[in-house]
Amino acid sequence: MKQKQIFKPASVKTPFLCVLVLAVLFTAAACKQSAGSSGGGGGYTPVPYEFAAVPAGVIPGTAPTYPMPGAQDFYKGVFIAGRTVTLSAYSIGKTEVTYNLWKDVYDWAVQPENGYRFANAGQAGSSGNGSGSEPVTKVTWNDCIIWCNAYTHKMKGEAECVYRKSSSDSTVLKNATDTAACNAAYADMAKKGFRLPTEAEWEYAARWENDHTNAEQYGSVWLTKLNSASGAKDKWDTNETKEVAWYSANSGSKTHTAAQKRANALGLYDMSGNAYEWCWDRHGAITADSETDPQGASSGTNRVKRGGRYSDPDSACTVGSRGNGNPGGTSDNTLGFRLACRP
């Protein structure tokens, strides 16, 4: 098992650090156990999925002072100058959701007694004939949030499902073809179920860099520079991108089995390249307002996608690059997702 990387601000004293280490390890173990136990007995062996724990943090934004792929705002991520983001502790998947895991949950979810409905069945990798260990693709954002509820229902019970009809109506969402309901979906972050990461959670995890290599300081934490792929030790237009990402220069125009490239400091794979990843947030301009656990724009149609894809140039696979897509209409063979959850 890959060793967890531990958050270690320079000012932390030894007794506090020991408590923090124990808390992080406990969170990781709890989330992993939840994703690896069926909750239903009967000798069922679930498809494994591992998480990395991310402790709470305060991230004061800063402007890049180094070369960037372009001057556009979409290269600059969410931790911009003048903005401070406070994040609660969470866990995030070490890999993109594979087709094997997707299909296992999908087949359970669509049984009449479980009542879930999807717009798309998903496929194995970019071709549809790939390995089951490649990321699932051809799924909309709507499909993903309904699948997250189904996975939670299957593994933890329906009560822990995150995605509900509204803040005042706790009905669990189960139908990805109900565009209006999905568009109005409410994320109950008090629940322990599986969900999409918020954009800030995604970027924080993608940029985690605790040995200060190719990183900038944001308060008490160090984050990979905006101009680099996740886990890369140099900027986008160097061979380092090939070490951590599948993209246009090395992918052969297709997805690949998860976790074949070097992981980042949190032990996360393919945060850059391979498949684009849906996030929870509505897409919109990032403002300098300080926020706690931000969830994106308050209005708008498109949802955020991050990380770039196997067909993109290196510049689109940087940790600061932001993308977006239609949540009910975008389901192509370059787009998948990974999971997050609260401890």
Where on the chain are the PLM-derived regions?
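Functional-site microenvironments in short loops/helix caps that host divalent-cation chemistry
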Residues: 143-319
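Short, polar loop/linker segments at the starts of domains and inter-domain junctions
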Residues: 61-87, 254-263, 315-331
